[in-house]
Design a protein with these regions (language model features):
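Canonical AAA+ ATPase core
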Residues: 1-76, 82-91, 128-130
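Residues that form generic nucleotide/phosphate-binding pockets
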Residues: 61, 84-87, 104, 147, ...
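C-terminal engagement/docking regions of AAA+ P-loop ATPases
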Residues: 110-180
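Conserved AAA+ ATPase small/helical "lid" subdomain
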Residues: 72-123
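Residues at alpha-helix boundaries and short interhelical turns
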Residues: 52, 91-95, 135-138, 159
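Secondary-structure transition/hinge residues
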Residues: 5, 52, 70, 109-110, ...
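An amphipathic alpha-helix signature
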Residues: 55, 59-63, 98, 102, ...
Length: 180
């Protein structure tokens, strides 16, 4: 899907722009659930835990009801989302920052399985988006560090149940000095 196309029964279809997938994974301790192979886990940009809403938010959710209508209001128009995605792509990354990402990935590869080129691309893309959300037009090392756990933990924990905390990210951050 990252190529902007899907195939169904041997027929290739172009995906609309903007396009992205949000997927959920059941807990591995549930019946009929098995871990995803490393190659499939690597295709997911991030693993996030949304947790539960606070009481007031859940009350608002219950009182509002559920409107499955495709005409329900959304937070962003497709055009606005596309503009934001384009702006993320244009966030400036210095050579020093790219070297920092490469250093993190290289250190991860000292142990199996290590981070793939897809992971390094995802890390930089997520850092670009984070920097935009922080109101900057360029990416700084703090942006990479902020998104690192969400981007790498599921890749380095391949086949293991989700853990609390970010042991792999913390180890990478300790092993790679952040030049400022």
């Amino acid at each position: 899907m990252a190529a902007g196309r899907v195939s169904v029964d041997g027929v290739s279809h172009a995906l609309p722009e903007p396009f992205f997938v949000i997927a959920t994974q059941n807990s591995l301790d549930q019946v009929g659930t098995s871990p995803l192979p490393e190659a499939q886990l690597d295709r997911f940009l991030m693993r996030l835990s949304l947790g539960f809403p606070d009481r007031a938010s859940e009350r608002a959710l219950l009182c509002a009801g559920f409107d499955p209508s495709p005409d329900s209001p959304s937070g962003l128009s497709p055009e606005t989302l596309q503009q934001l995605q384009d702006r993320c792509t244009n966030q400036h990354c210095s050579e020093l920052l790219i070297d920092y990402v490469l250093d993190l990935v290289e250190v991860s590869r000292a142990r199996h399985p290590g981070l793939s080129p897809r992971a390094s691309q995802g890390l930089l893309a997520a850092a670009r988006a984070w920097s935009l959300l922080q109101g900057r037009d360029h990416v700084v090392i703090d942006d990479v560090q902020a998104v690192l756990p969400a981007v790498v933990e599921h890749r380095l924990d391949a086949g293991c149940p989700a853990r609390h905390g970010s042991p792999h990210s913390e180890a990478l951050l300790q092993a790679v000095p952040a030049l400022r």
